[in-house]
Regions:
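Conserved donor sugar-nucleotide recognition element shared by glycan-biosynthetic enzymes
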Residues: 35, 129, 182-186
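Mid-domain Rossmann-like dinucleotide-binding core that forms the NAD(H)/NADP(H) cofactor-binding site
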Residues: 8, 15-16, 21-106, 110
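Structural detector of well-ordered beta-strand residues that form the stable sheet scaffold
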Residues: 56, 80, 145-147, 173, ...
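C-terminal hydrophobic helical "lid"/dimerization subdomain
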Residues: 118, 122, 134-138, 179, ...
Length: 234
């Protein structure tokens, strides 16, 4: 049975709940259960990115923006954001991206390899398509890592040069929910937010009422927003 997030009341198992301090803003805490945990967790738990690492993120929606926030947190440089939508790239810059590549205007792989002199060391894919994952892999330097957090359809298949994994000592890593332990990592990330080290506010495009939920889904589908928070008192 599913648990509804679009109702005034819901029933959840105790083991699915995370207790947080009252001092945390409850509205913003809603973002930590999925996007932040997945994106930031991929950086600090799965990949354990080191300061000064050359990085890139393919797809800067809610999860991709969270990856950017995580990369800024650990001191990666440069942080290259790749997307087809200008408004998403603008948000990525606010989140901490140092360079932007609009994939609707240029070949993102060629542009990224030119910018970095052969590819980035750690390249994250947060789109959920085999095309984006293939591009992310192609934009990774020799000896580098491609980390995928997107969820493609079960029928999708990825084709990459098999020899490159050995001959170029490449790594392809999967990260599910940021390799997080929720009871450990959600309070940890919330504290980083309270300290001002994790600029989560950039993810919230707007607050909406429960009656506006369908409009919210339309805006999300059109790529107009990163995340929206439903407030029941609007």
């Amino acid at each position: 049975q599913g648990v509804s997030g679009y109702s005034e009341f819901t029933v959840a198992a105790p083991e699915s709940l995370i207790k947080i301090e009252k001092s945390y803003p409850i509205e913003m805490a809603t973002l930590f259960g999925c996007a932040i945990m997945t994106g930031v967790g991929a950086v600090v738990n799965t990949a354990k990115v080191q300061p000064g690492t050359t990085t890139a993120v393919f797809g800067v929606g809610g999860v991709g923006l969270s990856v950017v926030l995580g990369l800024k947190l650990v001191g990666a440089y440069p942080i290259i954001a790749v997307d087809t939508l200008k408004n998403k790239l603008d948000l990525a810059k606010q989140a901490g991206a140092t360079h932007l590549i609009n994939a609707s205007e240029v070949d993102p792989v060629s542009a990224l390899r030119d910018l970095t002199g052969g590819g980035a060391t750690d390249v994250f894919e947060a789109v959920g398509s085999e095309k984006a994952l293939g591009q992310a892999y192609a934009a990774t330097r020799k000896g580098g890592r491609t980390i995928t957090v997107g969820l493609p359809s079960p029928e999708s298949e990825l084709r990459i040069p098999a020899l490159s994994i050995v001959a170029e000592e490449r790594q392809l890593l999967g990260s599910y929910m940021g390799s997080c332990v929720p009871k450990r990592d959600i309070p940890r990330f919330l504290e980083l937010y309270r300290e001002g080290r994790l600029q989560v506010d950039v993810l919230n495009s707007r607050f909406i009422s429960l009656d506006q939920v369908n409009e919210g889904f339309d805006a999300l589908d059109q790529g107009e927003v990163a995340r929206q928070i439903i407030k029941f008192d609007i």
